[in-house]
A protein has these predicted regions:
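Repetitive helical segments and hydrophobic/amphipathic motifs
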Residues: 30-34
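Extracytosolic ligand-binding ectodomains
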Residues: 21-25, 43-418
Length: 418
């Protein structure tokens, strides 16, 4: 019966019955196999609300970074990327964190919130266990929603907006917008730089408007006369003739610029053409103005701004960092590079304080680093005896630099009012 014509031995109805039984048996086997696979998958899934990366055989820490390496803000993201790389290389050469090496990966977000979230997801898929980033405030505010949901530790080197570290898993290395605004007003008043002050700010930018608000409040409290407060937006940031003229007509002795250096360079050039020569004072977004292509650096002479770092500082740590950075990347580091460099060493200090190892889950690493951050005191490039509160804010002293002969120099209090 195994050979020959089935029709000669089996009637049509019997043949159909045999075929149906065979199909049912095959289907049962396939269904059972599928259930085994499904149950195995369910057994291996973790808590969807928390990131569960990390395994018992993990032997390296995976640290990710996010910032703009292309686009208008590329100077900031590139500096952050390089600063992290320099610190990672040093730490790995010295034995790593708790004896474990660091793997490092950086993603470009073009200072865009949606791209920043995509970059975060890319790094998470890579296996990131802690994030240094993001570099700018608005993307950071978007990404912190993701890191909070995943209980991923996040330390931003340079995002200053209050909401960019609004959850307990997030910390910052830099000053916040409110801190920069109040510290700037205090410095101007206490060093008698001016009594009549104008402000030109970007009302469409979180960083700029945040600093403006606290500066205006603190300036009034310190007895400064804010004679003009002129806004511009992202859609109108090339012609500042109206804002400059209003500040000039109001008799401003000093103009406060809580903005980024790109717009500041245009304001300085246009004010010079208008014959308006007040004192100029900015914040950390001003760092990089001397490196802007096509900008006449002489227009920034005597420009002052608040920053935690200057490459011309004479202490040994800064001089070594600057020399190593120049050798590695061919540029002089700006504050963003120093902030990022410090971030890696801060994570190392917190991890060693809590004996963190890379075989732990992302969530466990985050919880340990959160605890460690509030217990360490850190001496770095961007401040001495830095401590952190549970809400992620650092406590450190600001530095004011001034542009002299095309270089940044630390401004001493006795020289400020000259």
């Amino acid at each position: 019966m195994l050979q020959g014509d089935w029709s000669s031995d089996v009637c049509s109805s019997d043949l159909e019955e045999i075929i149906m039984k065979m199909w049912k048996k095959a289907a049962s086997v396939m269904l059972a196999s599928a259930m085994v696979v499904s149950l195995a998958a369910c057994g291996s899934s973790g808590n969807s609300g928390k990131s569960d990366s990390g395994s018992s055989d993990a032997d390296t820490f995976k640290i990710g970074g996010i910032g703009p390496t292309t686009g208008d803000a590329a100077i900031y993201g590139t500096a952050v990327k390089n600063g992290i790389q320099l610190a990672v290389d040093e730490i790995n050469a010295a034995g790593g964190i708790n004896g474990k090496q660091i793997e490092y990966k950086f993603e470009d977000d073009q200072a865009d919130s949606e791209k920043s979230v995509n970059a975060y997801n890319t790094l998470k898929d890579w296996g990131m266990q802690a994030l240094i980033g993001t570099t700018t405030s608005t993307p950071c505010t978007a990404v912190v929603e993701e890191t909070h949901s995943d209980n991923m530790f996040q330390l931003t080197p340079s995002a200053t907006a209050v909401d960019s570290i609004q959850y307990d898993n997030a910390f910052r290395m830099c000053f916040s917008d409110p801190n920069q605004g109040s510290a700037s007003a205090d410095y101007i008043a206490e060093n008698k730089l001016a009594t009549k002050v104008a402000i030109i700010y970007n009302s469409s930018d979180t960083y700029s408007s945040g600093i403006y608000q606290t500066f205006a409040t603190e300036a009034k409290a310190k007895g400064l006369d804010v004679v003009a407060a002129e806004a511009f937006t992202a859609d109108n940031k090339t012609d500042f003739s109206v804002q400059i003229q209003k500040a000039k007509d109001a008799g401003a002795e000093l103009v406060f610029l809580p903005i980024y250096y790109q717009e500041a360079s245009l304001i300085l050039a246009q004010a010079n053409k208008a014959g308006f020569t007040p004192k100029w004072f900015g914040c950390d977004g001003m760092d990089g103005i001397l490196d802007l292509d096509g900008f006449d650096a002489s227009l920034a002479e005597d420009l002052m701004f608040l920053t935690p770092f200057t490459a011309n500082a004479t202490d040994e740590a800064t001089q070594k960092f600057v020399a190593d950075y120049k050798e590695a990347f061919g540029d002089t580091p700006i504050q963003f590079a120093a902030d990022a460099y410090d971030c890696v060493y801060v994570i190392k200090a917190a991890a060693e304080k809590e004996d963190v190892t890379p075989d732990k889950s992302v969530s466990d690493i985050c919880d340990a680093l959160k605890k460690g951050m509030t217990e360490i005191t850190y001496d770095g490039l961007t401040g001495k005896s830095i401590t952190w509160s549970e809400d992620g804010e650092p406590t450190k002293e600001p530095t004011v630099v001034v542009v002299k002969s095309g270089e940044y120099q630390v401004l001493q209090a006795e020289d400020a009012a000259e």
